[in-house]
């Protein structure tokens, strides 16, 4: 089971470095295999959150990642015949920067800044 967690965490790390990796991976997978990937990924993230006892703030970031992946998958499956804007599939790397914060104030500031940017659409802080 931990092998699967390692594989999916490794996949997420690759996506962090290259936001278009998710777009490329999803565009070459058929819908059935991608459904399996999605369920396996979410299950692995849940297990990782439980086994590593991740802070609630980090769990919130993981939840955002899962929602983003699900949203992108639905968008990809509904627009398979249409030219898709690759930028819309970039996982926002700044959210992952919150993961490296070691203290709570850093995580809170990082999360607030990203939430404001996500809502407003531009860098606020």
Swiss-Prot record:
Recorded superkingdom: Eukaryota
Other comments on record: Partially overlaps SNX41.
Protein name per UniProt: Putative uncharacterized protein YDR426C
